């Protein structure tokens, strides 16, 4: 799968603006940002737990 180019990103942005309207767009962006922060922190925590469990396995 190839990464999205500028034309595809522009189309997606236009669709988002049409669907949500320009008034709700800042709220949607804020919500997406919060969700991404939570997702990233959960991934870091999961990786940390996985490393700790593999360290425990190696010690035993």
From Swiss-Prot:
<keyword id="KW-0812">Transmembrane</keyword>
<dbReference type="InterPro" id="IPR006312">
    <property type="entry name" value="TatA/E"/>
</dbReference>
<keyword id="KW-0472">Membrane</keyword>
<comment type="subunit">
    <text>The Tat system comprises two distinct complexes: a TatABC complex, containing multiple copies of TatA, TatB and TatC subunits, and a separate TatA complex, containing only TatA subunits. Substrates initially bind to the TatABC complex, which probably triggers association of the separate TatA complex to form the active translocon.</text>
</comment>
<comment type="function">
    <text>Part of the twin-arginine translocation (Tat) system that transports large folded proteins containing a characteristic twin-arginine motif in their signal peptide across membranes. TatA could form the protein-conducting channel of the Tat system.</text>
</comment>
<keyword id="KW-0813">Transport</keyword>
<keyword id="KW-1003">Cell membrane</keyword>
<feature type="transmembrane region" description="Helical">
    <location>
        <begin position="1"/>
        <end position="21"/>
    </location>
</feature>
<dbReference type="GO" id="GO:0043953">
    <property type="term" value="P:protein transport by the Tat complex"/>
</dbReference>
<dbReference type="GO" id="GO:0033281">
    <property type="term" value="C:TAT protein transport complex"/>
</dbReference>
<protein>
    <recommendedName>
        <fullName>Sec-independent protein translocase protein TatA</fullName>
    </recommendedName>
</protein>
<keyword id="KW-1133">Transmembrane helix</keyword>
<dbReference type="GO" id="GO:0008320">
    <property type="term" value="F:protein transmembrane transporter activity"/>
</dbReference>
<comment type="similarity">
    <text>Belongs to the TatA/E family.</text>
</comment>
<dbReference type="InterPro" id="IPR003369">
    <property type="entry name" value="TatA/B/E"/>
</dbReference>
<dbReference type="Pfam" id="PF02416">
    <property type="entry name" value="TatA_B_E"/>
</dbReference>
<keyword id="KW-0811">Translocation</keyword>
<keyword id="KW-0653">Protein transport</keyword>
